[in-house]
From Swiss-Prot:
Main location: nucleus
InterPro entries to which the protein is assigned, alphabetical: CDK, Kinase-like_dom_sf, Prot_kinase_dom, Ser/Thr_kinase_AS
Cross-referenced Pfam families: Pkinase
Protein name as it appears in the record: Probable serine/threonine-protein kinase KIN28 homolog
Designated gene of the protein: KIN28
Length: 308
């Protein structure tokens, strides 16, 4: 049996508490508060919260474990171990120092165009590793994009992942990063929901604040339609048949140029392709990685020179 020393608490999510830990000399239990380290490499220990109704939390843990066992990529956080202790599932992951939300919110950090290009390319490569295995992440946001001390991206928090082709709930993805088809109640969706989320993260790297920060689903849709235009059947066949479709105010189709004056034409083109309302027309991850934006000047900032 492997034993881990659990040290300080790192953070807390919807269904788990995360602690800093280290491998220790084996004892009669997998988790201890003190002991002798056998490795100085830290790990993140994710303890699934105990509740009276644990089934939902356990399902999330199982989804995360299954997905991470399948994905082998330097752009995705690595699964190290799993165990049950004190009636709680624990997931041991590689420890990563910070996340993209912290970087974006840190006003002392200057984010240059090459930095944005490097980070969003790594995010896309991580998402591609999911999509090629027919896994939808369903919760891409800056807080779930971990950043190493060198600036390397690691996608994390796979508790909402599902396989492409399953009929699903629309209540996935944090609202600010949720695709319009989800906001309108679609249960028949796929990998394009992740691409919308990537677009929102891309925009946030330029703006340093969330692009669409609605307090309700209706307000969220209104903000999206104000910026991108209200969808019509001609451009998005079937939109009016979605379960939560309403007779929304008609806003004209607009360009993002005014909001992103510092973005290059290639960056704007990729952003508009990611934030396409009709999911059938939204750019795929593979095509996004091949977009001319990543070949244009300036080049992506090298690992080790990113502002972390």
């Amino acid at each position: 049996m492997k034993t881990y020393i659990r040290e300080r608490r790192l953070g807390e999510g919807t269904y788990a508490v995360i602690y800093l830990g280290y491998r220790a000399l084996p004892q009669d239990k997998p988790l201890v508060s003190s002991g002798t380290r056998i490795e100085d490499v830290p790990v993140a220990i994710k303890k699934i919260k105990p509740t009276k109704y644990t089934q939902g939390h356990e399902i999330s843990a199982i989804r995360e474990i299954k997905s991470l066992k399948r994905i082998d990529s330097k752009y995705v956080v690595r699964l190290i171990d799993t165990f049950v202790y004190d009636k709680c599932v624990h997931i041991v992951l590689e420890y990563v120092e910070t996340n993209l939300e912290n970087v974006i919110r840190n006003s002392d950090k200057i984010i240059m165009p090459g930095d944005i290009k490097a980070w969003i390319l790594m995010v896309l490569r991580g998402v591609y590793e999911c999509h090629r295995l027919f896994i939808i992440h369903r919760d891409i946001k800056p807080n779930n994009i971990l950043i190493t001390s060198e600036g390397m991206v690691k996608l994390a928090d796979f508790g909402l992942t599902r396989g492409i082709g399953n009929r699903m709930t629309p209540q996935a993805v944090t609202r600010w990063y949720r695709a319009p088809e989800l906001l309108m109640g679609s249960r028949d969706y796929g990998s394009p929901v992740d691409m919308w989320s990537v677009g929102c993260v891309f925009a946030e790297l330029f703006l340093r604040v969330p692009l669409f920060a609605g307090d309700t689903d209706i307000q969220q849709l209104d903000m999206i339609f104000r910026a991108l235009g209200t969808p019509v059947e001609r451009e998005w066949p079937g939109v009016s048949t979605l379960p939560e479709f309403l007779d929304f105010q008609q806003y004209p189709k607009a360009s993002l140029n005014g909001l992103f004056s510092a973005a290059s034409s290639d960056a704007l083109d990729l952003l508009e392709k990611l934030l396409t309302l009709n999911p059938c027309n939204r750019i795929s991850c593979d095509d996004a990685i091949k977009h001319p934006y990543f070949k244009s000047s300036p080049p992506p900032t090298p690992i080790g020179k990113l502002p972390v």
